[in-house]
Amino acid sequence: MTERYIVAIETGSSKIRGAAAVADESGMLDVVAVEEEKLIDSVRYGCIQNIDVSKAIERVCERLESSSALQEGTITGVYVALGGRSLRSDMVTVATELPAEMEITPAIIEDLKAKARAASDASRDVAAVVPVRFTVDNKAQANPVGTFGQSVGARMAVLTCAPQIKRMLRRVIEERLGMKIQDYIVRPLAEAALVLTDDERRLGCMFVDFGAETTTVAIFKSDAPAYLVTLPMGSRNITIDLTSLNYIEERAEEIKRISGNAMPAEGPRRPGVDGIDYSEVNTYVNARASEIIQNIVAQLEYAGMKAADLPGGIVIVGGGARLRGFSDLLGKHSKMKVRNGAVTGSVRISDSHINAGDYIDVISILQAAARLPETECVEFPEETETPEHTADGDYESMYADADDDEGTSRIGRGYDDDDDDDDDRRRKRSRRDRQEKGAPQRRRTAAKDDEFIDDDITDDEEMHRSSGIFSKLKNKLTNIFDGDGDDNFK
């Protein structure tokens, strides 16, 4: 398979996002469509709270299917992002003794991962197992595969989440929509893989995903995650603080986005032309932003590290990171260099209307999915051969199948309507084929499922229609070969 279509879904606290991309064998990812649906209070701290999420995902998928890149395709599977407050990382040490000195194979490493998975908290779902450090015969080994030894040990980061996270995702996607969840992908790890440089990961850095309701902090050292935690606070906390100034939440969010500044206000308070005292607004913004930043910086101590241990600095992503002055304030408190994460060159954006920096979350899921075993997320209808035009005068072959339903419908109708009917028939045949094969298929609303097909024509009506057709044919032939028509052959 030279290329394949990948679809990713990210269920955030403020919106549902979906994206489609084409991945090729070279590792290049071409993002062809991104859609989102605003949704408030249906997802809280990473966990789905309301079945409305299912409808939002369906609308997002329908818009993706309507894009030029996926025209006539049907989304049958998706990769889903995992994140939220319940996501945590635990370090587990495992080892295995080999019967004799032998080559370390990938199967042995997978066995170590299975042991780490089994050693995790049984009350939680395992989201990912990431190797941090290996030893072969008690000696550190960066990549043990291909080396020889009699014992292999590993320190693994086991990322887990609350069971209801996956359970609710299955309920709204697989049970309600009939689409298959191809795999779950831990969003913070995927985002870090997308925006961090090799030097930052090897030297050591802090990755921060500042979202609407949660903030995830991950520390990388020696090219592996050494620490990960999700804090139950985000940019929405700032918005809620501003509602105490007698603004509804939507207006408070708008004021924060347009005029908010995390850096402390300088000079006397001056009301704006719209009567809003922005100095007072930014006093609230600075107070809450400072609290969030203090909690971010405190994770260094909890991880047993200092700022000097992370020469790669801090890389920040997420909607909250766009707050004016937040990166500067974070650098001031942490005494570390701070930069905003950006999409790397391995990802190409086909649609010029897509600002890659605004969609790092869902694009990172696409990139992570492209590195997994090949699975198709989009099914296209089988191409049908177009019959060749019949030679002039070959009346018998032209009308041999005139009594066929599909052939009959072409006579006396415009070509545009005819083509639309052919497309509808192909889509229906494609859906029937998927049902017969047992392939997953997204459920449609009744208004879109109940496409009209005139199956109630009686035998008498059909005979009358056929009789009319052949009557027209007879008149046509008569006009050709009557006295007037003979003039053409003189």
Regions found by a protein language model. Give the residues of each.
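Phosphate-binding/catalytic loop of phosphoryl-transfer enzymes
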Residues: 147-148, 198-221, 227
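Glycine-rich phosphate-binding/hydrolytic loop that grips phosphoryl groups
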Residues: 342-396
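Residue-level signature of catalytic and energy-coupling elements of molecular machines
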Residues: 9, 18, 80, 173-174, ...
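Phosphate-binding glycine-rich/basic clefts of nucleotide- and phosphate-handling proteins
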Residues: 70, 84, 158, 163-167, ...
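Conserved, well-folded catalytic cores of nucleic-acid-processing
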Residues: 63-67, 119, 176, 245, ...
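Short glycine-rich phosphate-binding loop at a beta-alpha junction
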Residues: 72-83, 303-319
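Nucleotide/phosphate-binding catalytic cleft detector across ATP-hydrolyzing
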Residues: 1-15, 19-77, 82-204, 378-490
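Nucleotide-binding motor/catalytic cores of P-loop/tubulin-like NTPases across gene-expression machines
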Residues: 227, 316, 320-363
